[in-house]
From Swiss-Prot:
Disulfide bonds: none
Entry GO terms, CC: cytosol
Organism: Salmonella agona (strain SL483)
Primary enzyme class: hydrolase
Keywords carried by this UniProt record: Glycosidase, Hydrolase
Name of the molecule in the record: Pyrimidine-specific ribonucleoside hydrolase RihA
GO biological process, one term: purine nucleoside catabolic process
Gene name per UniProt: rihA
GO molecular function, one term: uridine nucleosidase activity
Amino acid sequence: MALPIIIDCDPGHDDAIALVLALASPELEVKAITSSAGNQTPEKTLRNVLRMLTLLKRPDIPVAGGAVKPLMRELIIADNVHGESGLDGPALPEPSFAPQSGTAVELMAKTLRESSQPVTIVSTGPQTNVALLLNSHPELHAKIARIVIMGGAMGLGNWTPAAEFNIYVDPEAAEIVFQSGIPVVMAGLDVTHKAQIHAADIERFRAIGNPISTIVAELLDFFMEYHKDEKWGFVGAPLHDPCTIAWLLKPEIFTTVERWVGVETQGKYTQGMTVVDYYFLTGNKPNATVMVDVDRQGFVDLLAERLQYYA
């Protein structure tokens, strides 16, 4: 039986590729997709969800737009990474259908309520929508199997020295998610920076030769440019968000540890930092499965294999 999931995302090149991977995978049943502000403004990320689903011919999936800003802060966007549209690079279709009239939280709640089994929430942007859902619907917590997030880092940040972008945008929301008592799986920079796509991998995807694999290659062409800055020391581009979907499909290609994680909301230098109790120093029980390593070749092979689904 396919695993029911809700995807909350802020497309974003890597979010878009996570959608491509999820919708090429019969092991997963994508029940709803909600958009958050983050990589771009809320209007643009919602439009990008609709553009991707139009491209993938999946207007049957309910879509709703989410919170327009973080719980307690002003919105920061990553247009320096993702461009003016949020998905700069390829020529994507205009949306062929409209989102639902309700909010992301309403769509998530309805989806959970109507599901006969617990649903996994995959969140690849800031945690604002998920936190709002948890706070407004305590009666639905039992219907959430787990929350798989792309965010945080045990080590170095990518937006500030201490903080990864998604968590930094809304640290209060992320703290609500981690302390919710619902199992959390964290794909942080420790693993996503190892899930790098190299130039040869992009050519491999392009050579698959179907319209979707070509678009993925073009998304990666653009995404590569930002990551060529030598300060990162990367060979390729880290494909952050697809790690969440890849873990659901093939957990064996990832190495994980069970640890307690808290989010710093106040620090002078460390706001948005995910504090991972690696050495069990706090006495707190683990609340998260933290990804720490990935078989890069296995990850690339999984993407290439699933891109052939669109032939």
